Design a protein with these regions (language model features):
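Alpha-helical structural signal in soluble globular domains
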Residues: 105-107, 192, 196-202, 233, ...
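Proline-centered loop/turn at the N-terminus of a beta-strand
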Residues: 201-203, 266-267, 304, 402
Length: 652
């Protein structure tokens, strides 16, 4: 219930029309609903302003008692709504997500009766099926965009908070993902969620509360009323890119017409697997080598076209596992309990995932198993994203227009995490996804032993150098090669050169790829661990991503020098960490942890990188931050350790 004055305004909408082909002129059409809640007629003035742009417009209108009328301001009637050289809104890595603000008032007899404000972005998002395989291709401001997206699942009990929303979306942006699909079995998220997506440059694919395993609502009028209010609430957000009625179902009669009536500026399809979007999979653990040969799905080729659901699990960290179940069920692994926390064993965490972990050597404790489990999760994520990088648009073996990772966030405590778990504790998958999706990226193909470079920027780079170095288990360099490249806007340079591994190389070894600019400054790097194990096909867990890693346990010890300082700025607590590998050995899979007085991770905390490796003499800066209200009482500490680095604890 709310009170109004003599006139009220609701549901503003700003439509942008951009001039082609330059996108250098915008025409804005503004509409708003004006309400007369009184029992008599009202004469009022409706006024608007695009703040900071010296754009103002107004109309005088009369409303009879109880009337609600949509008032429209067009650029033909108000030329000031024509904007030269508008600041366009762009998704992540494509440009700045610039935003404007619209303020509106309704006044009666010179007194403001009601007011509102909303932010909006000037951009155009379209899609078509003008592709070799008729898959759906998206465009932003006239440019093709390769969708590297994900599927958003709401918290299991809908226990949302601004803190949780901020953390999950900040992790999302950090990962490099550019689109979030609001899965049809979920909800329409909060205004704050969309506000953050606007600011972070994250596109949103919005579905409307129907899945393939549910019936249509009994009260369809109520459903359509909810649909109407949701579209009106969300349509000014530039991040909102696409409407889909359902997940693997059909639309409620009238849904499409209603959506197009309320907002004809975005595309629409009936359900998630039609109109150039094929059915998904894989969902569970497979041999990571299968991603390269495109055999990961039992449904056939799925690294092609637009795939709405393609993913793999990750084991949570040790600290989270101990919050999921009792110690007695953690180790030895109680298959019944683990399967219960894995959707009935759906992701194969107690079977195939465990077998992959054991290929790093049989574990003697849950601590050892959890540590090795992060390697498997990191390999899962990195191989998937890099295979899709390789096949981006028409640069690879087949046309690929987009991937939506299944799934993104954990709705409940479970043993099948993703980039982070329900407790908001990141796994190694976040940081290895972040590396795979960096906008300028050199990558290695485990099946072909080839090196490629991907550019996700809308600009080109000339006279860059890509370099590959291979080190054996004792950190001896056994291969090195570099090549100068020019890479075009949004381009992929595939199979630039092959790495020839020496026949006598240690069974496990490491690859470091570096990308340097024309001045010799390194702008990107990637680190891999690889075994000599031959890949014997998808039916068994073999291959250089998947088996033969036992000798990693014999890796010589490395030493890290750690320096740090703390500060508080604008309500955030920061730890600036400087690391240097002072030994002659590679420091493999180094992990930093910010812990409270009980030795538990401070959550949510944000690390610029983690689970990384450092060459002898290499340095790295890591910034950790959290809200200051997380560090008000007690002692806190920073731990630094790694696969072959003894963990050290530093009091903060």
């Amino acid at each position: 219930m709310y009170a109004t004055d003599k006139a009220a305004i609701r549901n503003p909408f700003i439509r942008s029309e951009l001039a082609k082909p330059g996108y250098d002129k915008a025409e804005e059409t503004v509409s708003v609903e004006v309400i007369n809640p009184t029992t008599g007629s009202v004469k009022c003035v409706v006024a608007g302003e695009i703040t900071g742009e010296n754009i103002r417009f107004s109309k005088e209108i009369s409303l009879f008692c109880g009337e609600t009328r949509e008032i429209v301001f067009t650029p033909e009637e108000f030329p000031q709504l024509k904007i030269d050289n508008p600041r366009l809104w762009w998704p992540l890595f494509k440009g700045k997500p610039d935003l404007y603000e619209l303020k509106m008032t309704v006044s009666v007899k010179g007194q403001v009766s009601d007011s509102l404000k909303t932010r909006f972005g000037i951009r155009e998002i379209t899609s078509d099926q003008n592709t070799p395989d008729k898959s759906r291709q998206f465009y932003v401001n006239g440019k093709k965009i390769f969708i590297r997206g994900t599927n958003w699942i709401p918290e299991g009990m809908l226990r949302h908070s601004d803190e949780r929303t901020y953390a999950e979306l900040r992790y999302t942006k950090q990962s490099g993902v550019n689109l979030v699909r609001m899965w049809g079995g979920g909800i329409a998220e909060s205004d704050y969620f969309f506000q953050l997506c606007d600011e972070m440059g994250l596109l949103v694919w919005q579905e409307f509360w129907l899945t393939g395993d549910t019936k249509h609502p009994h009260d369809q009028a109520l459903y359509l009323a909810n649909l109407e209010s949701t579209v009106k609430r969300l349509r000014n957000h530039p991040s909102l890119a696409y409407y889909v009625s359902s997940n693997e179902s059909t639309e409620v009669v009238g849904a499409k017409d209603l959506i197009m009536k309320l907002d004809g500026t975005r595309g629409y399809q009936m359900q998630s697997e039609c109109d150039g979007v094929h059915d998904g999979s894989p969902y569970k653990q497979v041999n990571p080598m299968q991603h390269y040969e495109n055999t990961a799905s039992p449904r056939g080729s799925r690294v092609d076209g637009f795939n709405p659901e393609y993913g793999a699990p990750t084991l949570p960290t040790l600290e989270t596992l101990r919050e999921v179940m009792d110690e007695k069920d953690l180790w030895p692994i109680n298959k019944e309990v683990w399967d219960y926390h894995d959707g009935g064993g759906f992701h194969l965490m107690s079977t195939m995932y465990k077998d992959l972990v054991n290929n790093y050597g049989t574990s003697q404790s849950i601590e050892e198993f959890a540590k090795k489990g992060q390697l498997v999760g990191a390999m899962n994520s990195k191989t998937i994203w890099e295979v899709w990088n390789y096949n981006k648009l028409d640069y690879g073996d087949r046309y690929c227009s987009g991937l939506l990772f299944w799934y993104h966030n954990c709705p409940v405590r479970q043993v099948c995490a993703r980039m982070w778990d329900w407790s908001l504790e990141p796994t190694a998958s976040l940081y290895h996804t972040q590396n795979a999706l960096e906008p300028l990226h050199a990558q290695f193909d485990y099946l072909k032993n080839m090196v490629s470079v991907c550019n996700d920027y809308y600009r080109s780079f000339k006279n860059y150098k890509v370099k590959a170095d291979v080190y054996d288990l004792n950190s001896k360099k056994v291969f090195s090669y570099s090549q100068r490249i020019d890479i075009g806007e949004d381009e992929v340079l595939n199979d630039l050169f092959k790495i020839d591994f020496p026949s006598d190389i240690t069974p496990v070894h490491f690859i470091r790829l570096g990308l340097s600019d024309e001045k010799g400054k390194e702008v990107a790097s990637t680190f891999y661990w690889r075994s000599n194990a031959a890949y014997e096909g998808k039916e068994i867990l073999t291959g250089p991503t998947s088996s033969g890693f036992e000798s990693l346990n014999d890796m010589p010890t490395a030493r890290l020098q750690t320096k740090y300082k703390t500060k508080e700025v604008d309500g955030r607590y920061y730890i600036e960490v400087s690391l240097k590998n002072t030994s002659s050995r590679i420091a493999f899979f180094t992990q930093l942890q910010f812990l409270d007085k009980a030795g538990k991770p401070v959550r949510p905390s944000f690390y610029t990188d983690n689970f990384f490796s450092l060459l002898p003499g290499e340095t790295k800066q890591v910034l950790i931050d959290t809200s200051v209200d997380k560090v008000t009482e007690g002692e806190f500490s920073l731990t630094v350790g790694g696969w072959n680095v003894q963990q050290k604890k530093y009091k903060l």
